[in-house]
């Protein structure tokens, strides 16, 4: 339905209730669809995206022109941008989801009771998932593919900034569903950009939506977490830290820190704070900071850092709490692993942290005493990604402690039920 027609009807709620009912109806046959049928749909989607590359790029150019006219930040435009390589990556991501094991029906635990009952815990789809996102058009494909593989229907509400790109990609997903004989309403894209549609989706649409997954900036995620009446898989922000210990290999530290910050500055796994062991100031601090500066990164330092490296802007209290999503990093000197743990515990968003060290005791403390969703040793924080974890595409990163945590892949989009086999037992 065209957006103008919907706006003229003044009935966003009715539209969303219809979408919710259609998703619920589609979720039933989808929940029992076989692996081969779901994979057929996924492979057809990937092929359709490749075949529609020019149409997708043309749609993306409309979004980019609007973004540039609005003067949006470079990091925002980067997340919005599609090109040949990124479209190929979207198609490959869908194929990687098709190659994953189907979690639905997997027996994840089984045991026998003394009375002879045989009990199995079995993976099942969640049902209907609502995904709310902003500028990343690839989320349309990633979310659609993952939800489908896990047997879930999905309602996609993309941002106005990516509306043309998302519609072009969504058309390819619907084509794949049609080819495989699956309900076309299994993957729906909300056809309006009115924010009232978000509020309706967060209400749960009278019980038709089981989970909400937001992908976007802090204000979006905060609104979702505040208003949602159904469970939410999300992270508020990615304030990711790297700690360089005195035992770290210097060349490794330089390479990892630069990659973690500069590979893609606008993603949630980009490092925002660098912590350097006080015992490594003379050996590691200046070379690592210089590597960042040479890579084009702005460095803001605490006073001990500025005492060693001249010309840096002073880091403020606000900097330690900031997700820059830009070529900016804050650097502090800390009192060894204890100081690093204290700093991270104070300022972390519990997303991703990395330690660069050769001392196994330091690594053990880092892993045992920090509680972020993802902890890395001698590796870039930019590996905080479902694809890099072997999950195929991810629907997001969750930092909560209920149900899903870390990359939300196909397994995390399932629940479970119990199957109990008896031979006539009755309870006394």
UniProtKB/Swiss-Prot annotation:
Which InterPro entries does the protein's record reference?
A: Ald_DH/histidinol_DH (IPR016161), Ald_DH_C (IPR016163), Ald_DH_N (IPR016162), Aldehyde_DH_dom (IPR015590), G-glutamylP_reductase_CS (IPR020593), Glu-5-SA_DH (IPR012134), GPR_dom (IPR000965)
Metabolic or biological pathway: Amino-acid biosynthesis; L-proline biosynthesis; L-glutamate 5-semialdehyde from L-glutamate: step 2/2
Q: Which Gene3D superfamilies match?
A: Aldehyde Dehydrogenase, Chain A, domain 1 (3.40.605.10), Aldehyde Dehydrogenase, Chain A, domain 2 (3.40.309.10)
Name the GO cellular-component terms: cytoplasm
UniProt GO BP: L-proline biosynthetic process
Main enzyme class: oxidoreductase
- Tagged with keyword Protein transport: no
Q: Which reaction does it catalyse?
A: L-glutamate 5-semialdehyde + phosphate + NADP(+) = L-glutamyl 5-phosphate + NADPH + H(+)
**Which superkingdom does the taxonomy of this entry point to?**
Bacteria
Q: Which family is this protein grouped under?
A: Belongs to the gamma-glutamyl phosphate reductase family.
Q: What is this protein called?
A: Gamma-glutamyl phosphate reductase
Q: Which gene encodes it?
A: proA
